Amino acid sequence: MTVPAVLDSAGRRRSPATLPGYHAGRPPRNKGMRYPADPPTVEEIVAVRRHAADDRHGWRVRAMIIVLWRAGLRVQEALALAEHDLGPRRGSILVRNGKGGRRREVGMDEWGWEQLRPWLDARVQLPVGPLFCIIDGPTRGRPWSGAAVRSEFRRLAVRAGVRRRFAPHQLRHAHAVELAREGVPLNIIQRQLGHANLGTTSIYLQGIDPEEIITAVHARRAPMMSASAGLRL
C-alpha cells in the first residue's frame, strides 16, 4: 500500500515527524542507549549547515545547530527557549528549566550570534511562541519537536556525506571538546553544560583524539627547577 506524501502549505514534501502528535507518548527509540563520544568535526558541522535550504526552514535548522554546537545546549533546552531568553549584548542564553529542573545561564560567542540572525529575523513574522517553532500549516508558531530535529539532522548529514552519527547530543559533545582544546577550565565547561558533577563532563571529553593527547604531552617543555632546590636534572 502506498502512503500518500505529506505536503506543507507550499506544496513541498513534509516529514511526518513534523506533524502535531507524531509519536506522542512514545519514548524515543534510542532512550537508554549510550553512544560513544564521537563528536563531528568543524568541517562536518559546516558541511551539514551548508546543505540546509536558504529559506525559513533552512534558517531554523541552521540556528538549531548553532545553539547546540556553540552554546552546548541539550535539544530539549533549545526547544524550550523563548526569544526573551536570548541576551546577545551579554552573549548569554538563559536556560530556565534544564536537566533536573536546574536553571542556568550559558555563554555563546559573537560568531554564533551572527549565525542566528537570519532565523531571528524570520521568527518575528510568525505567531508568538517558542523560539524554535513550526513554520507552516495550522500549527504555525507551535513548538518544533525533538523527533523532527533529529530527522532533519539525519537527512542533511546524508546529503552532506557525513558518515558518523550526526545528532543533537553529538553537537553538545563537540562544544565540550572544543572548549577543552581551547584551554577552558573543566569547571567552567561543567557549568556551561549544566552537569551536576565533573565526572559527567569528563565523559564528554573522551571525544578528544588520543593523537591530540600524545602530541600535547610530547610538546611539553623540560621541567623547571630553582637553583636553590639543589637537584640535578
Please tell me what each predicted stretch does.
Residues 1-233:
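Conserved catalytic core of the tyrosine transesterase superfamily
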